[in-house]
From Swiss-Prot:
Name of the featured protein: Tetrahydromethanopterin S-methyltransferase subunit H
Similarity comment: Belongs to the MtrH family.
Function: Part of a complex that catalyzes the formation of methyl-coenzyme M and tetrahydromethanopterin from coenzyme M and methyl-tetrahydromethanopterin. This is an energy-conserving, sodium-ion translocating step. MtrH catalyzes the transfer of the methyl group from methyl-tetrahydromethanopterin to the corrinoid prosthetic group of MtrA.
GO molecular function: tetrahydromethanopterin S-methyltransferase activity
Keyword Transferase set for record: yes
Pathway the protein acts in: One-carbon metabolism; methanogenesis from CO(2); methyl-coenzyme M from 5,10-methylene-5,6,7,8-tetrahydromethanopterin: step 2/2
HAMAP family: MtrH
Catalytic activity: 5-methyl-5,6,7,8-tetrahydromethanopterin + coenzyme M + 2 Na(+)(in) = 5,6,7,8-tetrahydromethanopterin + methyl-coenzyme M + 2 Na(+)(out)
Quaternary state and interactors: The complex is composed of 8 subunits; MtrA, MtrB, MtrC, MtrD, MtrE, MtrF, MtrG and MtrH.
NCBIfam families: mtrH (TIGR01114), PRK00979.1-1 (NF002142)
Length: 310
């Protein structure tokens, strides 16, 4: 195990601590709810859903967080402005945990950010994300909200190397006019969750994971990813699982451990239904990391899985 010379920044988002030296704080886990095709949704555009089933899923994630000591975030996805506002209203009432405001639509993301600001949920809200594709209207609208936390996505298709990812955060790498960190700061963001933007196997997945070391060495900011998307894009596994279904969850949940072992502070582990698999697996990795880091001067916090599960 390793310890960074750079002082590590620990964010406090509504009482949830994200960051620190490997082995110090437990990995924060985020499960996605209301994603495209989610069975609990009755109308994706209008945001009509089964509230009992949604509550049960969030409470299960909450329960697993209590059991293992790994804090949780509710990754709240919405296809439209109308839908995401309804989802956030529900999530805000049903749990005290932080939540991601997530959508493929910039208009929906902003609607979510504005809603969170209007009703006093801004301290729990994390924007997903400030990235190279964000246009001026979205950034200006984000600036006018009260949000202070955001994922900053290190995706650089022009240069998917470690240097290219660092560059897109730092100065735009010649692809955009300014670095993503400066763009985020201009929007009032001062709590950066650095997403290394993991791409498919053979197309930079390993490089993205290695970027985790670079981020924490250079800035000390919390780092993580939605690394579970890698198995989803693996053609061989998609074919193999047709006859061997048991292989899929092993790779899906297991991918998160790779991000953890590279110094990751948070993982977006995929569908919230996977909470009962993801939390024990990630807690186990945290125990390994904490035990290994103890000999080099890193002490785990009191509610770490190392103390809760041993």
């Amino acid at each position: 195990m390793f310890r960074f010379d750079k002082e590590q920044i620990v964010l406090d988002i509504a009482g949830t601590k994200i960051g620190g030296q490997p082995g110090e704080y437990p990995t924060v886990l985020a499960g996605t709810i209301f994603y495209g095709g989610h069975s609990i949704i009755e109308d994706e555009k209008a945001g009509v859903f089964d509230k009992d089933k949604a509550e049960a899923l969030i409470k299960t994630q909450e329960e697993m967080s209590d059991v293992t000591g790994n804090p949780h975030i509710v990754q709240t996805f919405g296809q439209t402005p109308e839908a995401i506002v309804k989802y956030l209203e529900f999530v805000g009432d049903i749990t005290d945990a932080p939540f991601f405001i997530d959508s493929t639509s910039g208009e929906a993301r902003i609607a979510g950010a504005e809603y969170a600001s209007e009703v006093g949920l801004e301290d729990r809200a994390i924007y997903n994300s400030v990235n190279m594709a964000a246009d001026e209207s979205e950034l200006e609208a984000l600036k006018n909200t009260k949000l202070s936390a955001s994922i900053v996505l290190g995706f650089n298709p022009m240069d998917p190397t470690v240097e290219g990812k660092i560059g897109i955060w730092e100065d735009g790498a010649g692809t955009i006019d300014k670095g993503l960190l400066e763009m985020a700061a201009d929007c009032g963001i001062d709590k950066y969750l650095m997403d290394v933007a993991v791409t498919p196997l053979g197309q930079g997945a390993g490089v993205a994971v290695r970027t985790s070391f670079a981020v924490k060495s250079k800035w000390g900011y919390p780092v993580g990813s939605g690394i579970h998307n890698v198995p989803s894009a693996w053609d061989w596994l998609r074919e193999y699982k047709k006859e061997h279904k048991e292989a899929w969850p092993v790779c899906d949940v297991g991918s998160n451990l790779i991000q953890q072992m590279a110094g990751g502070d948070f993982v977006l582990y995929g569908p919230i239904e996977n909470a009962r698999m993801a939390f024990p697996a990630c807690a186990m990795a945290d125990i390994f990391i904490s035990e290994a880091a103890k000999d080099i001067g890193t002490e785990a916090v009191e509610d770490h899985p190392f103390f809760k599960l041993l």
